[in-house]
A protein has these predicted regions:
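Extended, highly charged segments
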Residues: 1-212
Length: 212
């Protein structure tokens, strides 16, 4: 096409029977018209990417706050204090400067014993979850979590637990989750060495692979 044209009709790669008519600026050369549309495409692509990133961040934020809500429902007074500390550190809650600067030790997770005597540990808040999974547990221990919903990190202190212990730990993971009152709560379990925490992730958030 040439300078001065107001429109050009091009083939439609998605439908041969419906060619596309593109409006042109007759004062611009073909190259300038093409550059104009390319610049517009780049701006739209950038805008779409920005919106998608905002959606991703909002989704992650909602998941995090759902986790906090679940933990509050299951918490005791000590857990509530740690949840307050976490929310303060994350910028969701304002606390007095003296309390903010005071370094607190993360409380210990709950400990259970399975029928065969195996130790099972449960984090009751995100600070406990991080401490338990990333620092306390051995790489060979077994980690459990309710599948795709907010819940506690559960650790079986054994690299080859019995099926009975896995089932009992799974029941604990289901109880300490958003769906604790549901009759059927799927639970993932995997070796701790398969767990990792992404850079910049919020407390309690981890990713894993190879789950059963």
């Amino acid at each position: 096409f040439n300078k001065g044209q107001q429109e050009v009709v091009l083939n439609n790669f998605y439908d041969d029977e419906k060619p596309i008519a593109i409006t042109l600026n007759p004062s611009l050369t073909p190259s300038q018209n093409a550059q104009k549309y390319f610049s517009k495409y780049q701006k739209l692509t950038t805008a779409v990417n920005h919106v998608n990133e905002q959606i991703r961040q909002t989704h992650a934020e909602n998941e995090y706050l759902e986790t906090i809500e679940t933990q509050i429902q299951l918490s005791d007074p000590q857990d509530l204090e740690e949840i307050k500390d976490e929310l303060s550190e994350s910028g969701y809650l304002k606390r007095k400067q003296s309390l903010k600067n005071k370094k607190k030790k993360v409380s210990k997770p709950h400990r259970f014993r399975s029928t065969d005597g195996t130790s099972i540990l449960v984090g009751k808040n995100n600070l406990q979850n991080d401490q338990l999974t990333l620092k306390t547990a051995k790489k060979t221990d077994t980690w459990l979590h309710a599948k795709n919903i907010p819940g506690s990190h559960v650790i079986i202190e054994n690299n080859n637990p019995s099926e009975e212990t896995i089932l009992e730990a799974a029941n604990i993971a289901a109880y300490y989750s958003k769906f604790q009152n549901s009759a059927n709560v799927p639970v993932d379990y995997v070796a701790v060495k398969q767990i990792r925490k992404p850079n910049g992730a919020k407390p309690g958030f981890v990713i894993y692979e190879g789950q059963k």
